[in-house]
Curated annotation (Swiss-Prot):
F-type ATPases have 2 components, CF(1) - the catalytic core - and CF(0) - the membrane proton channel. CF(1) has five subunits: alpha(3), beta(3), gamma(1), delta(1), epsilon(1). CF(0) has four main subunits: a(1), b(1), b'(1) and c(9-12). The gene is atpD. This is ATP synthase subunit beta. ATP binds at residues 153-160. Keywords: ATP synthesis, ATP-binding, Cell membrane, CF(1), Hydrogen ion transport, Ion transport, Membrane, Nucleotide-binding, Translocase, Transport. One of its GO terms (molecular function) is proton-transporting ATP synthase activity, rotational mechanism.
Amino acid sequence: MPAKGVIQEIIGVVIRAKFPEDQVPEIYNAIEIPLEQGGRLVCEVQQQLGNGVVKAVAMGSTDGLRRGLEVIDTGRPIAVPVGPATLGRVFNVLGDPIDGGPPFGPEVERRPIHRDPPSFEEQSTQAQIFETGIKVIDLIAPFTRGGKTAIFGGAGVGKTVVIQELIANIAKEQSGFSVFAGVGERSREGNDLIHEMREARIDENTTVFDKTIMVFGQMNEPPGARLRVGLTALTMAEYFRDQGRDILLFIDNIFRFVQAGSEVSSLLGRMPSQVGYQPTLGTEMGELQERITSTKRGSITSMQAVYVPADDYTDPAPATVFSHLDATISLERSIAERAIFPAVDPLASTSRILDPNIVGEEHYRVAQEVKRVLQRYKDLKDIIAILGMEELSDEDKLTVQRARKIELFFSQPFTVAQQFTGRPGKYVPVKKTVESFARLLNGEGDHIPESFFYMQGDFDDVLAAYEASQK
């Protein structure tokens, strides 16, 4: 018989309920409140206050609640459906479908969203490059298969577009399964993404959406839902990993997860720490990130968008994410302002596997030479601004010309942005990327004006565009 209690107090989304002292719900248990207008409100127990009293955070709106209503302990944490039936569906934090499709019956397995990370013995640490088809990422900051990568950037520099392109590329080129967690972002963007994925076809019978699970806890949701929606998506991804699959987990935006934790922490009356963040910031981030890992059976490769408040990378939220990552992609406003998309800063982006033993000697050499040319150009910018290009040596003039071409060549037309730009998207394999930049560094493009390098795929596309203009 499930334990029953009554609501004592409601403050915003925090509910205080009293249960019999010998039947107090455990921490993280889901408790349900049957609503008078029909339906139920699920809350998660966060604190036990003694004398049978618990504090819980609501996963939905508390409109219409009042003191004295009955509360039922479910006896376990929030549990969400997992398995092949979840592919091509859209869920909320509780694992309820929100796409208008049929609900899931008892035949579908459900797993609790709170679980321990895999043990040390189970974890796998092989270093292998994961091809994305985006030139600047594959060359300068290659993703690790089964690793964690974050895309950092301020407001409006293109984080979500890069993530959308990655989902489309991976579904088409590698036919992998993806799980997308929309954490505290705009509902409109989520809606756009669903429609784009339904239209993007892998073959005649399959769309990108059919191979993707989507979980949303958007800006309009209470902080409890935004805090837990990442765990819901991760639980669904873990199922496929444990079945021996290689799965992709996209989280947009991990900063909103921190923000929701801060709101919940304040509502529960905890003392804030630096810059007003929750004192448990590191612990909460660790609980999520440590579960995103690869085992000997399968892998989870994760890509996370990280909003950087006021473009300040020393803010505790982005700084906490840094320590968990294998690769960092930094999007820069100054590059976006020049209409170079993706607006990746190659000198600020890093990857643990940019190592000749992993990516190969040629890839490593080309990447380092590209960085050297760009860094030299950056150093010369002050001299150019004061004295002009004429005062540079011939060698430096050539370096500047090549650096400008490299910057423009890092731009790339995206499939998901085709409706805005009118340019068909280009997927460039790693091999082609390395070869293209090697040819540029060797001087094969020195006679081509820099404008021909803008928004092209590989080096052959640049040559074709230039030759077409000469006819």
